[in-house]
A protein has these predicted regions:
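Extracytoplasmic/lumenal acceptor-recognition loop(s) of multi-pass membrane glycoenzymes
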Residues: 467-484, 504-571, 605-615, 763-764
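Membrane-embedded helix bundles of polyisoprenyl
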Residues: 141-155, 160-245, 258-277
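Start-transfer (signal-anchor) and selected internal transmembrane alpha helices
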Residues: 1-57, 258, 459-460, 812-829
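Membrane-interface coil-to-helix junctions
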Residues: 48-148, 168, 172-189, 296-303, ...
Length: 829
């Protein structure tokens, strides 16, 4: 391998060794290397933001920007990151007290905050964190485009502006504009692919082994799934390069060894995040699994057409017309060695075919059934298309071949025009974008003789990629908005600000918890509003939390990975909720109220209490955990029809009536009270005071077939009995509670005996001053004689071995270059 020269290398020659330019031009040369990446970044981020503005999305208009999990997870988790960095969180990086009554945070951090650009959120005021989250998308896409520009230059030298334009084509691929546009951690996979491509080239050049390991670690720190996909893509790139380059067998083996060893060390560096997340996933509440069902072939192929957005979870495989036309001319380009053309074409074809074959699709997803969009690896194909497009462009494609590729694109669009949901901006992108792209490439070819045409060609190429991608992004937003799940949600408003302020007015953590109430702004209002209620939505919600909260009457969805609050004073007493926020009298306003609550740590007698009411009643289960009889659970008379069900019961006048029917969806009427029932999402609902007659009559208009409210849907709360129970738990409970980031310590009254019960679900990872024992899903510790303090510490499962492995990897990372230096010194000596 020789040094870098100004002569272009052919596509099948060995890679350069990265020699340096001597003399005073070194600084200028280094600066000029930034032109291409900078162009790619500006075109990519600019096009996406232009589409953002064209749609009138916040802050360019009044349309909400956050959709689906962006509103429910990503913005709240970034607000939690802001709190953590600014020292205002009720928890730390290992554990959070804000949501789910206390949950691990490390796995959530890795999964939802792994994109390094997520740290932009901590640089703005908390009220504007949502804007920072939205900005992560164009910044990450721009970074991916810039890195692809660098990678293309390592594959084959060429003009910086041409590489920059094709880098932007990659950054603006259909997957990024649609499926990943609102998912910050997925977008890091777009960065990881060219990052690992550069690492592959270093392995082939037999240099920068530590840099390769660090690049692998950087890719895997972002997001497990997309990092795994990018790593598999890097394996494909390495295989292609090993086949096409003129290398000896020894060189190939050394490159393989460097790649394998650096990958292992890089992944081990991420093990403190990766291993706890893997174990948390195993301990999470199970969800329903579905088999991968490939889309029809015409739908799959239509996903490759520019600016195409088909309904639902269909693949977004396209890049801009310029990239498709160049890629289409690749096989015809005789300036490229035949072997190189065949190997790259075969690799690209095999990659895209693997998306439709269930066994290989499972491999792309880590041997798991794809959850959500099944084609989240589509960016890999887009990257391959851009690579072959660059190899074609760098080797001066003939105009006839370009015209033939453009004609094939138009013909394919015509054939696929009747595909279900075909439409939008596909034809304008193919005809308009394709024509301008072909014109630009024609001018570029003519520019070999008339240099004045080259700047015109460059301007046209930049303009067509920018315009076509802007249209594609806006089209993706508009067509996606037709789907119910994608309805944009507000993440900043006067109501949200007042909600936040109301929570702050009554915050008393850790003396008591504050429930942010309903209606909720997001599924993670505990994190978003810095409260401590049960509201929590995470892929890592533990099965132990589900088993603790579901029997008590908390509403949930997503198979139990999302929990909601419940306005119920018995549950408030169980979980030490001493403050609650509710909507105010005027729209958008919120009011906060305080109520007596036991401390977070209470003392229960050695002999467990059992409710006298029917065991299948949610009210009996609440009483058993509370340790006192506070409800009247009457027999219910059922009447009406299947769709208009009636229920009647007799309770003590003046008591407070509650309703629980997790199987019914519809509308409930009880006197002047009207409630929406959303089956398992609703939880326990208040009906109001029992009238003087003592008779309760409830009507449920339901659309749920073959279901009813069960045997004991009504419970009537005896408020004085509850007050007495709260008073007893307060008098015998902890006199002082201190909650650290992932620790809790309680001082108990002298002479306490029995069991100390912490108002925390017994999730894996807790270690206490005495052996932990279960108490109806809550954390509990037996009290030996003369015990006056109880303390517990949370450590995520897998953190300790993960840290040990990372330290070993770090030592290896430091030892390799040190050993190399010592060897060179000895050779010189």
């Amino acid at each position: 391998m020789g040094t870098v020269t100004s002569e272009p290398t052919t596509a099948d020659s060995p890679p350069p060794d990265g020699g340096r330019t001597p003399g005073s031009s070194r600084l200028g040369g280094r600066l000029s290397r930034l032109y291409g990446p900078l162009l790619a970044f500006l075109v990519t981020s600019g096009a996406f933001c232009a589409a953002w503005a064209a749609r009138g999305s916040f802050p360019f208009g009044n349309t909400g920007r956050a959709i689906n999990d962006q509103a429910n997870q990503y913005v709240p988790f970034h607000r939690a990151l802001w709190d953590l960095v600014h020292g205002q969180a009720s928890g730390d990086v290992l554990f959070s007290w804000s949501g789910g009554f206390g949950q691990q945070f490390l796995s959530d951090y890795y999964t939802y905050l792994g994109n390094p650009f997520s740290w932009l959120a901590v640089l703005v005021p908390r009220a504007h964190v949502d804007l920072a989250v939205f900005a992560i998308t164009p910044v990450t896409m721009g970074a991916a485009a810039a890195l692809m520009t660098v990678y293309l230059g390592k594959l084959q030298p060429g003009p910086w502006w041409q590489r920059g334009v094709l880098g932007a084509v990659y950054g603006l691929c259909g997957w990024a504009l649609s499926d990943a546009s609102y998912i910050p951690m997925w977008l890091w996979g777009l960065v990881a692919l060219p990052l690992l491509g550069i690492a592959v080239e270093w392995c082939l050049e037999q240099r920068r082994w530590p840099g390769v390991a660090l690049f692998v670690a950087l890719a895997w720190f972002g997001n497990f799934y997309t990092a795994m996909m990018a790593t598999m893509a890097a394996c494909v790139l390495l295989a292609v390069r090993l086949i096409t380059l003129d290398l000896t067998g020894a060189q190939r083996l050394r490159a393989l060894w460097r790649a394998a060893s650096a990958t292992a060390v890089g992944i081990l560096l991420t093990l403190p995040l990766l291993l706890p997340s893997f174990l948390s996933s195993g301990a999470a509440q199970p969800t329903k699994t579905a088999a991968f069902d490939p889309v029809r072939i015409e739908v799959f192929l239509a996903g490759m057409l520019p600016a195409t957005h088909l309904w639902g979870g269909r693949p977004r495989l396209y890049v801009a017309s310029l990239g498709l036309i160049l890629a289409g001319s690749f096989l015809f380009n005789t300036a490229i060695a035949k072997k190189t053309r065949l190997v790259w074409a075969a690799a690209t074809l095999l990659v895209v075919a693997s998306f439709q074959f269930p066994p290989t699709q499972y491999v792309w997803h880590g041997l798991a059934v794809p959850n959500g969009n099944p084609y989240r690896e589509a960016f890999v194909f887009s990257g391959m298309v851009v690579i072959v497009a660059w190899l074609a462009l760098a080797n001066r494609p003939r105009l006839l071949h370009l015209a033939l590729a453009a004609a094939l694109l138009v013909a394919a669009t015509f054939v696929l025009r009747r595909t279900d949901d075909f439409g939008g901006w596909t034809w304008p992108a193919v005809l308009g974008g394709g024509a301008v792209s072909l014109l630009a490439l024609t001018l570029l070819a003519l520019g070999e003789r008339r240099r004045v045409l080259v700047p015109v060609a460059a301007a046209l190429m930049v303009a067509v990629v920018f315009a076509e991608s802007t249209v594609a992004a806006a089209n993706a937003d508009a067509r996606r908005a037709r789907e119910r799940w994608a309805k944009p949600a507000a993440t900043s408003s006067r109501s949200i600000t007042e909600h936040w302020q109301a929570v702050r007015q009554v915050d008393g953590w850790p003396a008591y918890r504050t429930d942010p109430g309903a209606p909720q702004t997001s599924y993670n209002d505990g994190l978003a509003l810095r409260a401590q209620g049960p509201q929590y939505y995470s892929s890592y919600l533990p099965e132990a939390t589900y088993q603790a909260l579901e029997p008590l009457g908390y509403g949930y969805k997503n198979d139990g990975r999302t929990f909601f609050g419940a306005d119920n004073p018995v549950l408030d007493a169980i979980f030490s909720i001493g403050a609650r926020v509710r909507p105010g009298a005027t729209p958008g306003s919120w009011t906060a109220t305080r109520s007596p609550a036991p401390p977070l740590v209470t003392v229960r007698p050695a002999t467990p209490y059992t409710s006298p009411h029917p065991a299948d009643s949610v009210y009996a289960r609440q009483e058993t955990v509370l340790g006192a009889t506070v409800y009247e659970v009457p027999e219910v008379t059922r009447g009406g029809t299947a769709t208009a069900q009636t229920y009647a019961a007799q309770c003590t006048p003046g008591s407070e009536a509650y309703w629980y029917s997790p199987e019914l969806y519809g509308t409930l009427h009880a006197g002047a009270t009207r409630r929406q029932l959303e089956d398992r999402m609703s939880g326990v609902l208040p009906l109001g005071p029992v009238p003087a007659s003592g008779r309760l009559e409830v009507t449920v208009d339901t659309r749920t077939s073959g279901a009813d409210a069960g045997a004991h849907p009504i419970g009537c709360l005896d408020r004085p009995a509850l007050d007495a129970a709260v008073g007893h738990l307060t008098a015998t409970g902890a006199t002082k509670v201190t909650a650290g980031g992932h620790t809790i310590e309680a001082t108990l009254p002298k002479g306490s005996t029995g069991t100390a019960v912490l108002a925390v679900t017994a999730v894996p990872g807790w270690q206490c001053s005495a052996p932990v024992r279960p108490f109806h899903g809550l954390l509990a510790v037996p009290l030996p004689p003369d015990t006056d303090k109880v303390s517990c510490t949370f450590t995520p499962k897998g953190l300790t071995p993960g840290l040990a492995a990372a330290v070993l990897a770090l030592l290896t990372l430091l030892a390799v270059p040190l050993t190399h230096r010592l060897r060179r010194r000895r050779e010189r000596g």
